[in-house]
């Protein structure tokens, strides 16, 4: 900086160098600093507001999650006792005996309406009527004119029926003459079905549900018997809100000894279920495998050796006897054959033994603890024993 550029300050001596002034740019820098501080403060305030807002949302979400966890979707279940039976109504007084109805005459048969006028040569005879109106029958003796009228009426009816039958036959022949296309143009008529709503789905176990169950008893199809199983999965209502059959409930049933050759399943009918709370309901539903197949599979004992063992042994004895007979017969002429006719008797014994044992039925065994299914064959309504109480 040269000497000429330095302004002369008052109160200084000539030739003395004074301090440079800073007042020219001081006000501009102050405004910039204040603007910067204002912007920084505004950003800090926005950040604080954003932090408070996010914290409030997090607390609200936590509170709503806690409320959702504490609130159960399954309403509380209570039991209600059935109402006491109403008292028997008093016996109604006996009505007075109705007066006897007057006897009404029985009309003559309708065939008399078709009577024709008598011929000139015929002399109508007088009707001889035996009136028994008080009884259930009335005997009427008709004259020859009435007999002719009856015959004429029967002839008219037969003629009319013959004409109607001829008309129907002609229509049938017309349809047959139309060919196979006319027959195909008539579809099968089916009945319509109306939709309906299920009653109170909160306490309804709908038809078609499958109950998973574990056998408590061993099944042996030698003789008919009873069976029991334990429910292994909770069963809820049709809308999934109310627990109807708890896990651990006992189901009882029965089976028949009807296994035949070629069959690998046994039919079991499950009749009743009892819950741990003492609720019982009739099932009357068939047993199934875990996938819903009809019947319960198991181990099959076909009793092969019992059925064919005796016949095989007798056949073997017969074969060995014939072989020995041939050996003995070919040894020389001085040998005596003592087995003459023995082969036929042994064959008869084998046939008899096979006839007695061939019809032994197979036996199915199924051990306890195996998983089975029960196909619900009807809608089960628990509304008479269960009720829901709002929280």
Swiss-Prot record:
Residues 81-103 have a biased composition (Pro residues). The chain crosses the membrane at residues 33-53. It is found in: Cell membrane. Keywords: Cell membrane, Membrane, Transmembrane, Transmembrane helix, Virulence. It comes from the Bacteria. Disulfide bonds: none annotated. It is a single-pass membrane protein. Pfam families: TrbI. Signal peptide: none annotated. InterPro entries: T4SS_VirB10/PtlG (IPR047695), T4SS_VirB10/TraB/TrbI (IPR005498), T4SS_VirB10/TrbI (IPR042217). Induction: Specifically induced within macrophages by phagosome acidification. Induced at 37 degrees Celsius in minimal medium, suggesting that nutritional stress is a regulating signal. One of its GO terms (cellular component) is plasma membrane. Residues 1-26, 76-105 are annotated as: Disordered. NCBIfam families: T4SS_VirB10. Transcription of the operon is maximal in early exponential phase. The VirB system could be required for the establishment of the replication niche in the host. Belongs to the TrbI/VirB10 family. This is Type IV secretion system protein virB10. It comes from Brucella suis biovar 1 (strain 1330).
């Amino acid at each position: 900086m040269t000497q000429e550029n330095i302004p002369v300050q008052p109160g200084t001596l000539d030739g003395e160098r004074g301090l440079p002034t800073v007042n020219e740019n001081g006000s501009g820098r102050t405004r910039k600093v204040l603007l910067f501080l204002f912007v920084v403060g505004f950003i800090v305030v926005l950040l604080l507001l954003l932090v408070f807002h996010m914290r409030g949302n997090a607390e609200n979400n936590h509170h709503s999650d806690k409320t959702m966890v504490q609130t159960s979707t399954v309403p509380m279940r209570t039991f209600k006792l059935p109402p006491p039976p109403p008292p028997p109504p008093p016996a109604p007084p006996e009505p007075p005996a109705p007066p006897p109805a007057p006897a009404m005459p029985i009309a003559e048969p309708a065939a008399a309406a078709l009577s024709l006028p008598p011929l000139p040569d015929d002399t109508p005879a007088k009707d001889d009527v035996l009136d028994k109106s008080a009884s259930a029958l009335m005997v009427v003796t008709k004259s020859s004119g009435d007999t002719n009228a009856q015959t004429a009426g029967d002839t008219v009816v037969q003629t009319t029926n013959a004409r109607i039958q001829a008309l129907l036959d002609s229509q049938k022949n017309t349809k047959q003459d139309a060919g196979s296309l006319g027959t195909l143009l008539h579809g099968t008529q089916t009945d319509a079905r109306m939709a309906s709503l299920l009653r109170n789905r909160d306490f309804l176990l709908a038809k078609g549900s499958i109950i998973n169950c574990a056998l408590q008893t061993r099944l042996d199809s030698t003789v008919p018997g009873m069976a029991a199983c334990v429910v292994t999965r909770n069963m809820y209502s049709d809308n999934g809100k109310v627990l109807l059959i708890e896990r651990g409930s006992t189901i009882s049933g029965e089976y028949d000894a009807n296994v035949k050759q070629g069959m690998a399943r046994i039919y079991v009918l499950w009749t009743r279920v009892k819950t741990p709370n003492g609720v019982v309901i009739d099932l009357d539903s068939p047993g199934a495998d875990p996938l819903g197949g009809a019947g319960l599979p198991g181990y099959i004992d076909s009793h092969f050796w019992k059925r064919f063992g005796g016949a095989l042994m007798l056949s073997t004895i017969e074969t060995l006897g014939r072989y020995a007979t041939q050996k003995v017969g070919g040894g020389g002429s001085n040998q005596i054959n003592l087995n003459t006719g023995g082969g036929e008797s042994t064959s008869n014994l084998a046939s008899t033994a096979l006839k007695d044992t061939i019809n032994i039925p197979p036996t199915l065994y199924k051990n306890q603890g195996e998983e089975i299914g029960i196909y619900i064959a009807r809608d089960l309504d628990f509304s008479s024993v269960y009720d829901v109480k709002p929280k």
